[in-house]
Amino acid sequence: MNLEVKKIDTANARLSAKLSIENLEKRYDKIAQKIAQKVKIDGFRRGKVPLSLVKTRYQAQIEQDAQEEMIQEVLKNAFKELGIENKDLIGSPNLTKFEKKDTHFEIEADIGLKPTIVLDKIKECVPSVGVEVPNEEKIDERLKQLAKDYAKFVDTNTQRKAQNDDKLTIDFEGFIDNAPFEGGKAENFNLILGSKQMLEDFEKALLGMQAGEEKEFPLTFPSKYHAEHLAGKEAFFKVKLHQIQAREMLEINDELAKIVLANEENATLKLLKERVEGQLFLENKARLYNEELKEKLIENLDEKIVFDLPKTIIEQEMDLLFRNALYSMQAEEVKSLQESQEKAKEKRESFRNDATKSVKITFIIDALAKEEKIGVHDNEVFQTLYYEAMMTGQNPENLIEQYRKNNMLAAVKMAMIEDRVLAYLLDKNLPKEQQEILEKMRPNAQKIQAG
């Protein structure tokens, strides 16, 4: 074996090797013997099949196994020469050449190594942080909203006309070209006027109706309606209003606190205000982080933390971004890329910068998570997916299985870890007085659900 190994930088190495044809052929008998012990061929007892017959019937498999064995031997020798072990690798080596010549094979491969990351400039990367502390006006607004959310709906007299914020019970049926359409009919349907639960023009048409009244009205579906078969269509609806209920507003006092904080002993308005203040502060913090500071922090990490990246991982990320992009392309563009190898190569190359940044940030986040002992339990991943399923009307088990089949659970976990690491760095950079506010509010800022 003629082997040459070159370490390009701390995260990349390259090997080139020449191996004689005999190196491959000498492996055939041993591999054929292993196959002969397992296969069953008519007329022969298991383990008694002649090697010549095995070599003939399983020639392709024998050659493939021999080549794989030879490649593994080359890699083993390369690792030894580099002074590395499997734990030092990142991903699998990328075989860039395996070519058979008259007397030998030529093999070339790129090897990715776990990068060395120095985190001494992290503090320089974290932008200044200042979260808006909720004032009395904001707290009062939230209390009024809670009083509204927890208010009960009560029956009104039959003469009262429907108005915004009323709860209506209706039957309705929609028609297009005088024919009912799918999903356009419901009975005893509850609707809060002004909630945008239905199309705005539909809700407006119900304003002023009285219990027992029936009404017909035209309606044009928006051109970008989520149900494509209805988008832009002219329709008319028949509606019968059965019942109008109005909110019985709650006063903002200790009784409201007992309703909202039902699991609390001795709930008071003062305690509710503290909880609301805490939740508003955390909401302001999350909004500031998600809409502005996390992206700034990522840009700074990318710019200031410098280390060698394994090119094999960048190439894999480019492949992933390219494949994902194909799903959102028009059929004509996909066809164009399929017909032109040069165009496909150029399109894939356009993802290099994004892939490089993504790989780099992932390595940095992973290093920070290990240093600060920040992690995400598998149950937290499942809870996140359960919430996603609930919000999108999907079956949670089916969604989790879909993520599992597509090997996406690890990506979800990594995204959650990234979110926690970035928030941790930003929290540490809060002004001292706001860090104190945060520590004080965290225990008291339980999620207050709408009624």
UniProtKB/Swiss-Prot annotation:
Comment field on protein domains: Consists of 3 domains; the N-terminus binds the ribosome, the middle domain has PPIase activity, while the C-terminus has intrinsic chaperone activity on its own.
Task performed by this protein: Involved in protein export. Acts as a chaperone by maintaining the newly synthesized protein in an open conformation. Functions as a peptidyl-prolyl cis-trans isomerase.
Keyword Isomerase: yes
Family in the record: Belongs to the FKBP-type PPIase family. Tig subfamily.
Biological-process GO terms, alphabetical: 'de novo' cotranslational protein folding; cell division; chaperone-mediated protein folding; protein transport; protein unfolding
GO cellular component: cytoplasm
NCBIfam families (UniProt xref): tig
Entry protein name: Trigger factor
PPIase FKBP-type domain location: 165-250
Location of the protein in the cell: Cytoplasm
Enzyme Commission (EC) number: 5.2.1.8
Gene Ontology MF, one: ribosome binding
